[in-house]
């Protein structure tokens, strides 16, 4: 997609983090913007910001884990703007801790948002884009799915999150292959950020009442501490990611990385797989982090 002005972008998780920055960047490029978020107040604020800039904007409160709400989002976008050219399946949440300490509700919440949210978005908006292409022979579409470096790596205390992000990488690669197979006027990309301040570490604020969080275990408290520590130390911002992403869209680039240096860890993992070695120590280059994590778990267990 080389032209953005006048095109329509749909963004889930638009109220904060990457989603908010995607919306601001789309506005800067003179796109029409459809905002979706489960959190009503944050959705209101980004809508106000864009309207103050004179942007044509539609805001829809949406729980992406519900297919009927994604369908309603697509219907609202078409009713308002008549087409959708760019979709960011971006909404995401996080839950961390030892795998056996996660409840069924933890899994259902994170898988619902991170995985089913993207599945619904891909299925519904890809079909919608094909319909748009039937009407406009010059139509070009692009779908961007937010995964993570956790889509390539596995680390302690990250089972639920890593599982969903691995799924998104695979789903998006399959989408790419299917689109190429039929020579579709649609392209796609997958964003694989490392630690970037987005607010996802506080995503429990949007956890639905029917999937309550239990009392946190020592491992879950320690994981939360370590995630927040890593995010605070990041030198890459959500705005940086938005700029990288729009450049990638313009250049039909599939993989989008915030921290290319982390690809060395991916190579190490692939080497283990190819050599049939047991999974390696993700902290081998930074053993102090493992020590800190173990100590923090012990500290939380004693409180």
Predicted regions and their residues:
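SDR active-site lid
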Residues: 181-260
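Conserved glycine-rich Rossmann-like NAD(P)H-binding loop of the short-chain dehydrogenase/reductase
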Residues: 29-45
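Residue(s) in the substrate-gating loop at a strand-loop-helix junction
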Residues: 148
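Canonical Rossmann dinucleotide-binding motif of NAD(H)/NADP(H)-dependent dehydrogenases/reductases
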Residues: 2-34
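The beta1-alpha1 cofactor-binding region of Rossmann-like NAD(H)/NADP(H)-dependent oxidoreductases
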Residues: 40-41, 61-72, 104
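Active-site helix of classical SDR
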Residues: 122, 164
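Substrate-binding pocket helix/loop in short-chain dehydrogenase/reductase
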Residues: 98-99, 103-108
């Amino acid at each position: 997609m080389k032209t953005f002005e006048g095109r329509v972008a749909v963004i889930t998780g638009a109220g904060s983090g990457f989603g908010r920055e995607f919306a601001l960047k789309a506005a800067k490029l003179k796109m029409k913007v459809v905002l979706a978020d489960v959190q009503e107040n944050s959705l209101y604020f980004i809508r106000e910001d864009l309207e103050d800039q004179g942007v044509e904007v539609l805001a829809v409160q949406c729980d992406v884990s519900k297919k009927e709400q994604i369908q309603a989002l697509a219907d609202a976008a078409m009713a308002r703007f008549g087409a959708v050219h760019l979709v960011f399946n971006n909404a995401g949440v996080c839950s961390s801790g030892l795998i056996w300490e996660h409840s069924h509700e933890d899994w259902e919440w994170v898988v619902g948002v991170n995985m089913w949210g993207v599945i619904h978005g891909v299925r519904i908006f890809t079909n919608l884009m094909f319909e748009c292409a039937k009407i406009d022979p010059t139509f070009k579409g692009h779908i961007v799915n937010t995964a993570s470096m956790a889509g390539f790596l596995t680390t302690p205390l990250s089972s639920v999150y890593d599982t969903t992000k691995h799924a998104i990488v695979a789903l998006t690669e399959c989408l790419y292959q299917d689109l190429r197979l039929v020579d579709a006027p649609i392209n796609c990309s997958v964003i694989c950020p490392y630690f970037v301040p987005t607010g996802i570490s506080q995503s429990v604020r949007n956890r639905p009442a029917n999937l309550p969080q239990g009392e946190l275990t020592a491992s879950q408290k320690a994981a939360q501490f370590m995630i927040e520590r890593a995010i605070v130390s990041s030198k890459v911002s959500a705005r940086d990611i938005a700029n990288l992403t729009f450049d990638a869209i313009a250049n039909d680039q599939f993989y989008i990385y915030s921290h290319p240096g982390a690809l060395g860890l991916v190579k190490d993992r692939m080497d283990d797989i190819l050599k049939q070695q047991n999974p390696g120590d993700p902290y081998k280059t930074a053993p102090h982090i493992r020590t800190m994590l173990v100590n923090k778990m012990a500290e939380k267990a004693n409180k």
